[in-house]
């Protein structure tokens, strides 16, 4: 059974990441079962400090027993995912070259992804049947409110 450890920056991601990863895995391979370890929540402001991301990546690797992958999912806020992502990935890989690691940075906020997917969520969990995405979901601040 494949193992995955996730590192996230916010409370919303702690709850959502295991569910989203399982749903994506199910869509790709209905027979796949993942062993998703408890999510590590570390604020982005701490993870950007030299040595902290590396420490948390090593902790995540130990949670997988050294056999699995690591997903790092963070809000990029006012940064640029295309610029910040490769540097964070480089640092993460330098901490644990023996495991596959992915860094995913949400432009502004992770929750904006749900705004972008509004049409696919219509009529679910009490959402309006005519729900529409805002013109530019990634510019919305406070998307979870």
Language-model regions, residue ranges each:
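Phosphate-binding/switch region of NTP-binding enzymes
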Residues: 9
